[in-house]
From Swiss-Prot:
Residues 101-205 form the FAD-binding FR-type domain. The gene is mmoC. Keywords: 2Fe-2S, Electron transport, FAD, Flavoprotein, Iron, Iron-sulfur, Metal-binding, Monooxygenase, NADP, One-carbon metabolism, Oxidoreductase, Transport. GO terms for biological process: one-carbon metabolic process. It comes from Methylosinus trichosporium. Responsible for the initial oxygenation of methane to methanol in methanotrophs. It also catalyzes the monohydroxylation of a variety of unactivated alkenes, alicyclic, aromatic and heterocyclic compounds. The component C is the iron-sulfur flavoprotein of sMMO. Residues 1-92 form the 2Fe-2S ferredoxin-type domain. This is Methane monooxygenase component C. The keyword Protein biosynthesis does not apply. FAD binds at residues 215-229. It is an enzyme of class 1 (oxidoreductase).
């Protein structure tokens, strides 16, 4: 038996485990850590700071080679070969010590095209007796939605907040996507769909009142919008900036919604960029990285081939700008894979 120490952002918890068990499976009987598919989606990513382990069946998209070298692991794919010390990116109160219901039935309330390649889907959780009830989640989390009559599921982040009582999703349409086809040809108001979740560890962290900078491209706006809406409902006084971008102007969406949100939140600034555009009408020409560079007055290296150097450069920039730009004192990122 090995001693496994899971350290949260504000404490730690221990559990002994047999070598044949991954951490997520062993923990299920007593506690629920943040996880989703149990098969390598990267929701349960953590840092191993000490000990020997074996990572089994991990996709390179979930843990790239450079991250694996740095000690990144997926708890659902990590099998200990010695005592381990693991760091998770959330606080102790995110761990549940009782069973959590993760399967739900929901009804489609709206399914509307909001740009050339984006659909707004609104769901309402329901019970068999048609009583509508809310589904509790943390802004930034996601659920899996199943196409009726199939076993095909896709993961999408909520753009709404739990207090609204509805689940709003901003979904990109892909040419050969199964869920994209469902949205365009089959989805109807009143139709019921199965949900699984919520899941995910990408959410707002305590930042001590410092300013926040949110960066979102395309439908990556969805979880960010949920977070900002939550800040608005809480009347959070901290300065916040949203940098949002798309490739072409016809792909723009929620411009009016963002403008209204900024008007209702005096501490929120919104900037929008379009790559293939001359700018104007409240839109800048360029990428969200261009907006971020202007916001922080630093240079970033781009390109997949330079990922390691980019990360090292960004880390150096954070060190150089900690005093001048509080937003760089901590950063949180969630990678999104195309999901049609």
């Amino acid at each position: 038996m090995y001693q496994i120490v899971i350290e949260t952002e504000d404490g730690e918890t221990c559990r002994r485990m047999r070598p044949s068990e991954d951490w997520i499976s062993r923990a299920e009987a007593e506690r629920n850590l943040l996880a989703s598919c149990r098969a390598g989606c990267a929701t349960c990513k953590a840092d191993c700071t000490d000990g020997d382990y074996e990572l089994i069946d991990v996709k390179v998209q979930a843990v790239p080679p450079d991250e694996e070298e740095d000690g990144k692991v997926l708890l659902c794919r990590t099998f200990p070969r010695s005592d381990l010390h693991l760091l998770v990116p959330y606080t102790y109160d995110r761990i549940s010590f009782e069973a959590i219901q993760t399967n739900w039935l929901a009804e489609i309330l709206a399914c509307d095209r909001v740009s050339s390649n984006v659909v707004r889907l609104v769901l309402q959780r329901s019970r068999p007796m048609a009583a509508r009830i809310s589904l509790n989640f943390v802004p930034g989390q996601f659920v899996d939605i199943e196409i009726p009559g199939t076993h095909t599921r896709r993961s999408y982040s909520m753009a709404s907040v739990a207090e609204d009582g509805q689940l709003e999703f901003i979904i990109r349409l892909l040419p050969d996507g199964a869920f994209s086809k469902f949205l365009q040809t089959e989805a109807k108001v009143g139709m019921r769909v199965d949900l699984r979740g919520p899941a995910g560890s990408f959410f707002l962290h305590d930042h001590g009142g410092r300013s926040r900078v949110f960066v979102a491209g395309g439908t990556g706006l969805s979880p960010v919008l949920s977070m900002i809406r939550q800040l608005g409902k809480a009347s959070d006084p901290s300065p916040a900036t949203l940098l949002f971008g798309v490739t072409n102007r016809e792909e723009l969406f929620y411009v009016d919604e963002l403008k209204t949100l900024a008007q209702s939140m005096p501490t929120l600034g919104v900037r929008i960029a379009v790559v293939n555009d001359d700018g104007g009408n409240g839109v800048d020409k360029g990428t969200v990285i261009d907006l971020l560079r202007a916001e922080l007055e630093i240079d970033l290296l781009l390109g997949h081939a330079r990922r390691r150097r980019r990360r090292e450069t960004a880390r150096s920039c954070r060190e150089d700008h900690r005093d001048r730009c509080p937003a760089w004192r901590s950063d949180f990122l969630e990678k999104f894979l195309a999901s049609g």
